[in-house]
């Protein structure tokens, strides 16, 4: 039996049951230990599963009886390792993706700001306009939607004066980008830190500080314009009966009529007009040139002022002001200095005389033959009509004094006579008919017929502005800007000499006046005297504006510019006071005297230049004659 049960090559010790081979005993012991280890590991896994998943006790006994095959064990291990690897890779890619998000992409707004800032910093000769462009270009990608809502939702009545929403947003985007970059500086690499430094360089330059100030000023203008146009928008949208003003957590609801009163609108219009003037001065002083050259401009202005105070003002200095541009600019500088110290913001905002006129305009009681709103830079037709009503009453106060009437008549005679003399004509006949016209207007018996004649032409107010400035001067300037085709053909014909062209222009003017004389209803009325004056002055003005660019042309242009500037001044809150009739009349008279003095000074300088040229030519002829006599 022992032979059957024993394996070949193995002998058993009697009574012990141990194999005779010692190495086999060691292998059996190791196998037993490995089985115990596997069972213990299975037990520990089962215990961990029970603890983690909180399984019932019955599940424990069922789990203890489950046995996995080696293939299942391998699949379980591979699945666990794969799951852990996938989780690790997902976490790794998520961190990498977050880092990429922190960096600025080339098409993102911040990168646009940095690129344009680098370009502005690298260009040494960049001017004020280029820096403005660099700042505003960043808006197109950062504040596109916000600016569109702001611009289109609020209406654009005053959009021609400022487009400040985009410009301000561009400056804010630069500042916000700079602050955010500094706050997250730990997540930026070295190249990005260099970009942040480049952003800070141009913002702190005087040029860009000036631009930022202008952007904020334009933003204030835009807000005031929105406030002024709010009533029009509210009328279009009647559903919005009230507005909400947020102040922290509190919301106040007030009626629109209580917030935007008529007095507030008038004060806001005055403030806006002052702001527009200030904006134009900024652009004229610094906008078209480099701000670094402002000191040079100030030095030049100082030199002009110092030259004006020198007592020994020789012939050469006198002749230097004969040109229209230099003389007008110097006069405007002096005038601006005087006005700057005369009026304050309080006087501009408090204009009861103007407010009363605005009430009359709202009631439809003010009439004007021609609305010159845009030409005189008024805020609207209502603003123009209200100021016109005040100006009419002020001129009545001025003309009520005989000294003022004499001054206006003498000034008109001198200026128009100088134009005729400049055209190489004799002003004697003109002065005679001019005196007859003044005598006719002084007779009160003719005022009724004069009023009827002017009313037939649309002039319903016998006033210095309506008759002289608007009907006579401004209409004449407009007619000369668009002359008849026949006159244009004669003037533009290169085969005709200047004398023939001048005669043709004069003949055309006389033929037009002859036709108008035939249509007169009163043979010796206002228009009869007026056409008699036009027979002498109209050909001179027509040839002066349409003829060659000579000294007569310069004089006519200077005369026209002074009239236009005077009209703009009297419709400007900065130059005149609309607080009362007396103050407005005083300011109008001062402006009349100033413009008249400028014209007279120009005429004297031109006459002096003409005299000096004649003397120089005469001296040259005399010296040539003496030289010839010596040679003989």
UniProtKB/Swiss-Prot annotation:
Disulfide bonds: none
GO cellular component: mitochondrial outer membrane; mitochondrion; plasma membrane
Keyword list, A-Z: Membrane, Mitochondrion, Mitochondrion outer membrane, Phosphoprotein, Transmembrane, Transmembrane helix
Cellular compartment(s): Mitochondrion outer membrane
Any one Gene Ontology molecular-function term assigned to this protein's record: protein heterodimerization activity
Location, primary (coarse class): mitochondrion
Phosphoserine: residues carrying this PTM: 289, 293
Family: Belongs to the mitoguardin family.
Summary of the function given for this chain in its UniProt record: Regulator of mitochondrial fusion: acts by forming homo- and heterodimers at the mitochondrial outer membrane and facilitating the formation of PLD6/MitoPLD dimers. May act by regulating phospholipid metabolism via PLD6/MitoPLD.
Assembly information from the UniProt record: Homodimer and heterodimer; forms heterodimers with MIGA2. Interacts with PLD6/MitoPLD.
Bilayer topology: Single-pass membrane protein
GO biological process, one term: mitochondrial fusion
Transmembrane segments: 70-90
Organism of provenance: Homo sapiens (Human)
This protein's name: Mitoguardin 1
Pfam families recorded: Miga
């Amino acid at each position: 039996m022992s032979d059957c049960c024993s394996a070949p090559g193995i002998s058993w010790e009697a009574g012990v049951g141990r194999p005779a081979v010692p190495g086999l005993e060691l292998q059996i012991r190791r196998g037993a230990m490995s089985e115990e280890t596997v069972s213990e590991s299975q037990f520990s896994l089962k215990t961990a599963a029970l603890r983690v998943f909180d399984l019932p006790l019955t599940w424990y006994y069922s789990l203890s009886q489950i046995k996995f095959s080696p293939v299942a064990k391998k699949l379980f291990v591979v699945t666990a390792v794969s799951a852990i690897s996938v989780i690790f890779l997902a976490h790794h890619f998520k961190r990498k993706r977050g880092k990429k998000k922190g960096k600025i992409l080339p098409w993102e707004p911040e990168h646009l700001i940095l690129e344009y800032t680098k370009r502005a910093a690298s260009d040494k000769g960049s001017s004020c306009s280029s820096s403005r462009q660099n700042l505003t270009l960043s808006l197109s990608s950062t504040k596109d939607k916000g600016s569109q809502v702001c611009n289109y939702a609020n209406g654009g009545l005053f959009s021609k004066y400022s487009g400040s929403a985009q410009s301000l947003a561009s400056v804010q985007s630069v500042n916000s980008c700079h602050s955010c970059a500094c706050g997250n500086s730990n997540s930026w690499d070295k190249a990005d830190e260099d970009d942040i430094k480049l952003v800070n360089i141009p913002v702190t330059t005087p040029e860009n500080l000036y631009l930022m100030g202008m952007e904020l000023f334009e933003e204030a203008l835009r807000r005031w314009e929105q406030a002024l146009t709010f009533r029009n928008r509210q009328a279009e949208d009647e559903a919005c009966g009230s507005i909400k003003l947020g102040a922290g957590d509190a919301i106040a609801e007030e009626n629109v009529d209580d917030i935007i009163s008529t007095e507030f609108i008038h004060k806001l219009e005055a403030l806006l007009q002052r702001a527009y003037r200030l904006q134009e001065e900024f652009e004229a002083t610094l906008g078209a040139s480099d701000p670094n050259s402002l000191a040079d401009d100030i030095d030049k202005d100082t030199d002009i002022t110092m030259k004006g105070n020198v007592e020994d003002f020789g012939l050469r200095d006198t002749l230097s002001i004969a040109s229209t541009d230099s003389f007008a600019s110097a006069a405007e500088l002096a005038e601006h200095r005087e006005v700057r110290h005369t009026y304050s913001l309080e006087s501009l905002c408090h204009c009861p005389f103007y407010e009363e006129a605005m009430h009359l305009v709202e009631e439809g009681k003010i009439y004007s033959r021609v609305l010159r709103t845009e030409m005189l830079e008024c805020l609207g037709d209502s603003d123009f009509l209200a100021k016109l009503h005040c100006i009419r009453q002020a001129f009545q106060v001025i003309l009520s004094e005989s000294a003022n009437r004499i001054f206006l008549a003498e000034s008109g005679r001198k200026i128009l006579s100088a134009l005729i003399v400049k055209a190489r004509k004799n002003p004697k006949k003109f002065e005679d008919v001019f005196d007859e016209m003044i005598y006719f207007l002084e007779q009160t018996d003719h005022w009724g017929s004069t009023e009827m004649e002017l009313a037939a032409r649309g002039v319903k107010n016998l006033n210095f502005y309506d008759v002289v400035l608007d009907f006579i001067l401004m209409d004449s300037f407009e007619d000369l800007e668009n002359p008849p085709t026949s006159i244009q053909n004669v003037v533009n014909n290169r085969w005709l000499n200047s004398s023939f062209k001048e005669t043709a222009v004069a003949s055309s003017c006389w033929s037009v006046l002859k036709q108008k004389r035939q249509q007169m209803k009163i043979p010796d009325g206002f228009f009869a005297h007026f056409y008699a004056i036009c027979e002498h002055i109209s050909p001179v003005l027509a040839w002066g504006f349409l003829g060659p660019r000579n000294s007569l042309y310069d004089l006519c242009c200077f005369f026209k510019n002074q009239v236009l500037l005077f009209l703009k001044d009297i419709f400007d809150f900065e130059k005149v006071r609309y607080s009362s009739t007396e103050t407005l009349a005083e300011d109008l008279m001062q402006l009349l005297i100033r413009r008249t003095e400028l014209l007279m000074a120009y005429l004297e300088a031109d006459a002096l230049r003409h005299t000096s040229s004649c003397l120089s030519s005469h001296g040259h002829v005399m010296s040539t004659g003496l030289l010839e006599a010596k040679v003989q």
